[in-house]
């Protein structure tokens, strides 16, 4: 039985929590970089806890192993189903087309990948058409086997032709649309060569990565010139009154929903805390530029409850 990491590290709920960093935009981006870089620190944050850097990925893995069976249901409840629209908006920005090659990192349950596959399928020409585009490929990449298991089961339910890494056969003619499932760490995409993908998405996953700058550099490496990086993530609310209400909801309601629905208050307490530790919109944009992305911008939803960050790889 998996020991819940959040319970091991649980501490009393703080009496006063700020959703905003008071440091300046420019300097805070470099502070965020250092705090997520294990080469400069022996410890890192796991929610509000300081833990050995080498331990964080395993602690995060245990959290998502615990929440995997109820992950999508909890997303609906926590966001009042708004996460569905945010993911639709994310995929709209990609505008996937037949023949494209896409990677969705931390996408275990397939929520984003299925949307991308649907868009591609709608644009595929009839099988009897004289023109057939190259095969499309959508890769779901996640560190947690439990999340991938849920995604594969959903893919089978929806009728997708899924391919596991161990099942790939180079001698077989690929179908028009391939949906692949890969287990691995966002910081290490070494199984993929440089310039492999047209687009890269990560939805509600980057804040759980131990070394965010390293993951961003890997994202830049595997994208083709002209490729687009898109990240959907909880962010910093701009309006003071909304921020206060959102703070109360996050720390008092979400863990309670997790306890009632998923029988796991502690994991959702960690997830709420991890949102507060994530860099601001400007800080994260600066991190994208440091990783080599250009034309970096972000779009806030609900005044910054979540944001979609975008950047392009323009060099070779």
Task: Identify what each model region corresponds to.
Residues 12-62:
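N-terminal auxiliary segments of SAM/dcSAM-dependent transferases
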Residues 101-189:
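Class I SAM-dependent methyltransferase SAM/SAH-binding core
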Residues 187-200:
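A short acidic, Gly/Pro-enriched loop at the edge of an enzyme's catalytic core
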Residues 198-212, 235:
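A short SAM/SAH-binding and catalytic strip from SAM-dependent methyltransferases
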Residues 213-228:
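A short glycine-rich, Lys/Arg-flanked "PGG" loop and its adjoining helix->strand segment in the class I
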Residues 228-258:
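Conserved class I S-adenosyl-L-methionine
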């Amino acid at each position: 039985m998996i020991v819940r990491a959040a319970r091991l590290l649980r501490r009393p709920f703080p009496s006063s929590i700020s959703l905003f960093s008071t440091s300046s935009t420019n300097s805070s981006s470099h502070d965020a970089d250092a705090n997520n870089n294990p080469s400069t620190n022996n410890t890192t944050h796991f929610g509000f806890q300081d833990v050995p850097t080498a331990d964080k990925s395993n602690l995060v893995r245990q959290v998502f192993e615990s929440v995997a069976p109820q992950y999508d249901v909890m997303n609906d409840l926590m966001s009042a189903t708004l996460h569905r629209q945010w993911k639709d908006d994310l995929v709209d920005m990609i505008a996937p087309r037949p023949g494209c090659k896409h990677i969705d990192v931390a996408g275990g349950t397939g929520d984003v990948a299925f949307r991308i596959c649907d868009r591609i399928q709608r644009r595929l020409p009839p099988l009897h058409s004289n023109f057939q585009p190259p095969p499309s490929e959508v890769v779901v990449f996640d560190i947690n086997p439990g999340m991938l298991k849920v995604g594969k089961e959903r893919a089978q339910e929806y009728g997708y032709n899924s391919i596991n890494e161990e099942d790939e056969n180079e001698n077989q003619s690929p179908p028009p649309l391939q949906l692949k499932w890969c287990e691995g760490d966002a910081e290490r995409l070494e199984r993929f060569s440089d310039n492999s993908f047209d687009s890269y998405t990560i939805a509600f996953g980057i804040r759980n990565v131990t070394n965010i700058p390293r993951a961003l550099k890997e994202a830049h490496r595997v994208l083709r010139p002209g490729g687009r990086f898109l990240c959907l993530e909880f962010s910093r609310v701009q309006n003071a009154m909304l921020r206060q209400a959102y703070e109360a909801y996050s720390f008092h309601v979400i863990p309670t929903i997790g306890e009632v629905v998923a029988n796991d208050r502690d994991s959702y307490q960690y997830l709420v805390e991890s949102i507060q530790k994530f860099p601001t919109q400007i800080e994260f944009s600066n991190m994208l530029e440091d990783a080599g992305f250009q034309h970096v911008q972000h779009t806030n939803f609900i005044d910054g409850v979540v944001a979609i960050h975008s950047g392009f790889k323009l060099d070779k």
